[in-house]
């Protein structure tokens, strides 16, 4: 059934002139009222999803971010196929989603392998940003890992029209933890939600290759430092829920220190 167009609305927000790190960071995420899309998915989620997700009383009523925009919402990690569950829900038009894909890919690459990652840009002019942001294209991509179960879903294309859908379990989780429908929605290691701790302004004027070079540089500038700091925080969150594997990643002193900050 055609879910109909996605109506886009936004949080009133102020983009800080200095887009540095903070524990709460810049909260703004694009809000999408998914019209028939989320409504239809929510109906489909009734049934087996509840037993998979489990009790919801562990979700805090207040949003307090433990570190770098990452907050624990479940004490016991939610598992899919025996592995800690990670879910990225975004939209191709969304500048915050475009910015979040960089640390997400860097962190997840430490636990498995992406295949088919493409390149794309967010939509220029969205959410007050008069520029587009180069980023990864998750639509043609897949991910395999011996430690994690990961799914990426882009629910809207560059024009805000429906693209990919969530399955029942994903919809139940999304609607429960993110009832306003804000994207990017990033559920990490079956236990955490993560928000972007820096502004998309940080990526302004950079090409895809320039951002990739910054992220992989041994002496990164402010852009690479911000992305890598979030990648490390996501890595630590994953390590706390997957048995600290692989040891070559989770045993690194910097990651160990972050794990202690995120421990329940």
Where are each of the predicted segments found?
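Sec-dependent bacterial lipoprotein signal peptides
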Residues: 15-44
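Non-globular targeting/processing and membrane-anchoring segments
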Residues: 33-85, 99, 106-109, 113-264
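Intrinsically disordered, low-complexity segments enriched in small/polar residues
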Residues: 8-9, 17, 134
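Short glycine-rich or small-residue beta-strand-to-loop segments that form or flank ligand, phosphate
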Residues: 85-91
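Conserved redox-active cysteine motifs that mediate thiol-disulfide chemistry
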Residues: 91-102
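Intrinsic-disorder-associated, low-complexity terminal segments enriched in Asp/Asn/His/Tyr and depleted
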Residues: 2, 10-11, 21
């Amino acid at each position: 059934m055609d879910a109909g167009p996605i109506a886009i609305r936004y949080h009133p927000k102020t983009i800080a002139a200095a887009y540095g790190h903070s524990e709460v960071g810049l909260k703004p995420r694009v809000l999408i009222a998914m019209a028939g899309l989320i409504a239809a998915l929510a109906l489909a989620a009734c049934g087996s999803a509840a037993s998979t997700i489990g009790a919801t009383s562990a979700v805090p009523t207040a949003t307090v971010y433990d570190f770098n925009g990452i907050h624990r919402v479940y004490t016991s990690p939610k598992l899919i196929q025996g592995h800690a569950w990670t879910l990225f829900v975004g939209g191709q038009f969304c500048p915050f989603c475009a910015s979040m894909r960089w640390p997400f890919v860097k962190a997840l690459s430490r636990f498995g392998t992406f295949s088919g990652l493409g390149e794309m840009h967010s939509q220029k002019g969205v959410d007050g940003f008069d520029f587009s942001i180069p980023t990864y294209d998750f639509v043609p991509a897949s991910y395999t890992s011996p430690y994690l179960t990961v799914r990426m879903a882009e629910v809207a294309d560059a024009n805000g029209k429906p693209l990919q859908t969530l399955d029942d379990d994903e919809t139940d989780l999304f609607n429960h933890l993110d009832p306003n429908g804000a994207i990017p929605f990033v559920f990490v290691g079956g236990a955490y939600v993560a928000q972007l701790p820096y502004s998309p302004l940080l990526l302004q004027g950079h090409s895809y290759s320039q951002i990739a070079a910054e992220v992989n540089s041994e002496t990164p500038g402010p852009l690479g430092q911000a992305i890598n700091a979030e990648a490390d925080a996501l890595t630590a969150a994953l390590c706390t829920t997957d048995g600290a594997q692989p040891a070559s990643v989770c045993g690194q002193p910097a990651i160990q220190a972050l794990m202690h900050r995120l421990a329940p």
